């Protein structure tokens, strides 16, 4: 099946950052906003692929502090690219960049407004920049504020140190539809991942569509 081919390519080609705990998405013939595999084909051969999904994993940070409405708005607004891969014999052909843009389009068509990605090396970071992403420095936390009942709720997501070059990248693909959002960055300190609200450098802020 095509889904198996895309899944196997991602598992084989992604050296760092592939989350093996994630289940393989089922086929999505109705194109719903749920975990989805995207394949790039040339002459009936798979040349690249991507795995996109609502960012349900990071939404749990809002749920953990009792902000259920903010968690729902975050998950509905933020699309996570879990991985992009290109077949070895088709690298340096611009396929990865085209796949990234396809992921952005998929997110926007499903009413998400932010696409998140985690480049794990300098080459991947450059590709994200070419695709229009804001790329944070390595090991810097991504901070997201979701407005819930006129109260801004902030969660910061540190970057694990297992892969030193890992960094957050984000791209604004539409105006928020579910809740006002802001995105920023900060350095988190201590074993508990503490941060100072005043130390967050906000980079993007937008209200919902009228």
Positions of predicted regions on the chain:
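C-terminal "cap" of GNAT-fold acetyltransferases
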Residues: 141-210
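Conserved beta-strand-loop-alpha-helix junction that forms the acyl-donor binding cleft
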Residues: 116-129, 139-146
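Conserved acetyl-CoA-binding loop-helix of GNAT-fold acetyltransferases
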Residues: 86, 92-105, 130
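Short, high-confidence coil segments that cap the C-terminus of an alpha-helix
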Residues: 35, 110-112
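Extended low-polarity, hydrophobic cluster-rich segments
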Residues: 78-80, 102, 106, 114-116, ...
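Short secondary-structure junctions
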Residues: 134-138
């Amino acid at each position: 099946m095509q889904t198996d081919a895309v899944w196997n390519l991602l598992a084989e080609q992604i050296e760092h950052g592939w989350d093996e705990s994630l289940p393989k998405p089922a086929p999505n013939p109705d194109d719903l906003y749920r975990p989805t595999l995207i394949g790039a084909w040339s002459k009936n051969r798979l040349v690249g692929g991507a795995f996109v999904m609502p960012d349900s994993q990071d939404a749990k940070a809002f749920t953990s502090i009792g902000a259920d409405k903010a968690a729902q708005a975050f998950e509905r607004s933020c699309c996570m690219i879990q991985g992009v891969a290109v077949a070895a014999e088709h690298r340096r052909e611009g396929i990865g960049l085209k796949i990234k843009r396809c992921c952005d389009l998929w997110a926007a068509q499903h009413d998400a407004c932010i696409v998140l990605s985690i480049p794990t090396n300098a080459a991947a970071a450059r590709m994200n920049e070419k695709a229009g992403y804001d790329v944070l420095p390595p090991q810097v936390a991504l901070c997201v504020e979701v407005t819930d009942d006129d109260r801004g709720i902030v969660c910061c997501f540190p970057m694990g140190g297992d892969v030193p070059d890992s960094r957050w990248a984000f791209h604004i693909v539409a105006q928020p539809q579910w809740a006002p959002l802001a995105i920023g960055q900060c350095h988190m300190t201590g074993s508990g991942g503490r941060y100072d609200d005043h130390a967050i450098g906000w980079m993007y802020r937008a209200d919902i569509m009228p």
